Amino acid sequence: MGSYISSPQVLTRQVSGQFQVGCKDLMIDGTVLGDRGLFMRLYFPTDSQAADISSYPLWLPKPQYAHGLGEYLGQSSQKMNVITSTVVGEKREDCIENAQMSTKCDKWPIVVFSHGLGGSRTFYSTYCTSLASHGYVVAAVEHKDHSACWTYQLTEKNGELVEQPIKIKLIEKNEKNEFKIRNQQVGKRVTECVKALNVLEQLNLGTVPEKVLIGNDYNWAQFKNKLVMSSASVIGHSFGGATSLASSAYTTDFQKAIVFDGWMYPLDSTQQEQAKQPTLFLNVGDWQWNENLDVMKKIISHNDGNLALTLNGAVHQCFSDFPFIFPSWLAKKFGVQGRTEPSLCMQAAIELSLAFLENGKDGAQKLKDEKFSSFISNEIYGREKYKL
């Protein structure tokens, strides 16, 4: 199935490092890890080269992801089928599926990535593959807390693996028990991020987790002694931003956090108080609002190593793949592209992330001042600023 009004077939990395990028999905049975287990896509440096277009994985692994996204957006399956066939088509991620890990470095730093509400493990591939091209191993978790647009788990029945869908849970704003539901979800998300870190530690020790449901065909032994477990970071967008804060509050094994346009609502007072690891906040001024920023400012005050920056002319989805899935005119129509070019927003997100991960607050601030001051400010503000 081709796309007729789309950008190039492979999503090009915006700030490519020295490495080609490989990827591999890993799903582990919940009976081993408890609850619903773990599903994630690992992105990592590779020395391999793509044989042909089929080496690159599809951005939409199954049509159900589009249908679930449509449900989240209030669009019918029929309409999403049209959008998928005419716009998305066989869009592919810029990484080589089933590639081997690069042997050019002794060890690789690790990052766990948490998607936003209605997201998936593939919706941030531009960012994740770009980080991997700079020498990071990125574990993009697909959350099973009913916040992903759609996901699934595999269960054994009569000797065969059966796919059980996990659909998005739609919650009306101000619905009774809304906070309780969202806080429970963020708790589940934290559990999955910690599980991802634990699985990476197992792989680094040369141990393959029990009951691997997806990924049995891969040589995981190559991860042995290749990961820098002492400096793990957690990164997330929106709901994933809250997840990254709550994860770093839960365990200091996450040495740093990065929050893209974070949604603070799901965090309870304990999580807010305990989020004290050095954190980079990258906000979109047009999306943030005062009530949300009040919580964020409280967390920012916990550590002198925290840094908050605001992107001007950007949109909430500028950290995801969506601005690059659609041609510019359609991206603007759908509200996934703002006044500032998506490529510039993504470049800033990637380069500031690298600067913060490698050189902390001072490194990110220096880069912002030298390169991105035309559209990124140290002022913390939301949409109310424009109503004055």
Swiss-Prot record:
Record: active site: 238 (nucleophile), 261 (charge relay system), 316 (charge relay system)
SUPFAM superfamilies linked to this entry: alpha/beta-Hydrolases (SSF53474)
InterPro entries per the UniProt record, alphabetical: AB_hydrolase_fold, PAF_acetylhydro_eukaryote
Catalytic activity: a 1-O-alkyl-2-acetyl-sn-glycero-3-phosphocholine + H2O = a 1-O-alkyl-sn-glycero-3-phosphocholine + acetate + H(+)
One GO location term (cellular component): cytosol
GO biological process: lipid catabolic process; morphogenesis of embryonic epithelium
Keywords: Hydrolase, Lipid degradation, Lipid metabolism
EC assignment: 3.1.1.47
GO MF terms held by the record: 1-alkyl-2-acetylglycerophosphocholine esterase activity
Gene3D superfamilies membership: alpha/beta hydrolase
Pfam families with a match to the protein in the record: PAF-AH_p_II (PF03403)
Family statement: Belongs to the AB hydrolase superfamily. Lipase family.
Protein name: Platelet-activating factor acetylhydrolase homolog 2
UniProt organism field: Caenorhabditis elegans
